[in-house]
Amino acid sequence: MSADFGLIGLAVMGQNLILNAADHGFTVCAYNRTQSKVDHFLANEAKGKSIIGATSIEDFISKLKRPRKVMLLVKAGAPVDALINQIVPLLEKGDIIIDGGNSHFPDSNRRYEELKKKGILFVGSGVSGGEEGARYGPSLMPGGSEEAWPHIKNIFQSISAKSDGEPCCEWVGPAGAGHYVKMVHNGIEYGDMQLICEAYDIMKRLGGFTDKEISDVFAKWNNGVLDSFLVEITRDILKFDDVDGKPLVEKIMDTAGQKGTGKWTAINALDLGMPVTLIGEAVFARCLSALKNERIRASKVLPGPEVPKDAVKDREQFVDDLEQALYASKIISYAQGFMLIREAAATYGWKLNNPAIALMWRGGCIIRSVFLGQITKAYREEPDLENLLFNKFFADAVTKAQSGWRKSIALATTYGIPTPAFSTALSFYDGYRSERLPANLLQAQRDYFGAHTFRVLPECASDNLPVDKDIHINWTGHGGNVSSSTYQA
């Protein structure tokens, strides 16, 4: 029996993706470096399905239909390169290697170029949705060698999640574009999770809500504009009790881990000069949470305001305001994410399909939500939309949410409740809508101490301050008039 495609890596994600493909009528060849894993999988979960095993890499390759389609679901980094180097000598020109792991997009760029020279087609595909998504329909974000797409399109779109009947999978773009979009997806995921945690913290510490009451609030929100996977699971987590009848969430150490994809997004935003502030703050919030011992010490020596029992006088209005704050901040997070994708496309020379990207995230993935349907609609109406905030639906939504957004942050700040993600979202919004920012003074400072020059406003131009010219002023009368390009502030 020949397989439609093969998959290497039989951890839970790999097994579930194979089972998903078999359910959709595809024959899959499974391989793992530990043979016992293959044997156990074939004898149990895969029994009776169109799944075959292989005893070696050579045996694995020999069982694939041409062009061979090899999907890797192994740990990102060196293991991917090692496996590719092992497989390539056994392949022919036109065969396809698909990396479905959480690889960093520069690695995918490199692999794309290296394999291109050897005539091998490379696809770097983001896979989102966790174990359940892999089994019943993930969000898939493939990019790389576009010649590979006709050969894998039917498989990928068949096994992917569906939203309103459309597959949550479409070709993203060349080189590492697929893994880039997955990286931004993960960064937005960081932001969404942090915003939800801040809403939980505000309700608990400021409103005195119990976990069950907060769960009820999230349940209500999940029936409205905030309907999403993360709000849904938060509802479930907060009502889950341990064996002693107490909320399990209260027993969990308040130190958050991270695998690095949020950090990658924040660093890339800095590299491209994009103010993706919310994802950055979400990453730093996790870093701060890791300083548990220092925070315990600081809590004993650094004073702050006490929260009075009557801090929240109208619970219903308080919850409504907080819902608006969460909704508006979420809009900012996605606006920033798509700003970054837009800039990446321009910088890296990629032609990316924003409506398709939004649709891919509409179902099957961790950030899936009803909200993404509006983003898909916005980009379908205007594919070159500069910013989501210029779309009438989102502009109106933020305008309507402003009052509750500002009140929630002001109240939390008054009583010392940290809101890094909420606050940076609002600061970005206020900065973005400001025709004039204080960067004029900043640029004057740079010119004063480093001769970095500045430009004048067209309406302020004169003979000594010409328009569209880099100008340096001798601010003290003691310096020179030579512009510096070596000392940067």
Curated annotation (Swiss-Prot):
NADP(+) binds at residues 9-14, 32-34, 74-76, 102. The lineage of its organism: Eukaryota, Fungi, Dikarya, Ascomycota, Saccharomycotina. Catalyzes the oxidative decarboxylation of 6-phosphogluconate to ribulose 5-phosphate and CO(2), with concomitant reduction of NADP to NADPH. Belongs to the 6-phosphogluconate dehydrogenase family. Present with 101000 molecules/cell in log phase SD medium. InterPro entries: 6-PGluconate_DH-like_C_sf, 6PGD_dom2, 6PGDH_C, 6PGDH_Gnd/GntZ, 6PGDH_NADP-bd, 6PGdom_BS, NAD(P)-bd_dom_sf, Pgluconate_DH. Pathway: Carbohydrate degradation; pentose phosphate pathway; D-ribulose 5-phosphate from D-glucose 6-phosphate (oxidative stage): step 3/3. The keyword Amino-acid biosynthesis does not apply. The gene is GND1. GO terms for biological process: cellular response to oxidative stress; D-gluconate metabolic process; pentose-phosphate shunt, oxidative branch. Homodimer. Its EC number is 1.1.1.44. Substrate binds at residues 102, 128-130, 185-186, 190, 259, 286, 446, 452. Its main location: cytoplasm. It is found in: Cytoplasm. The modification Phosphoserine is found at residue 50. This is 6-phosphogluconate dehydrogenase, decarboxylating 1.
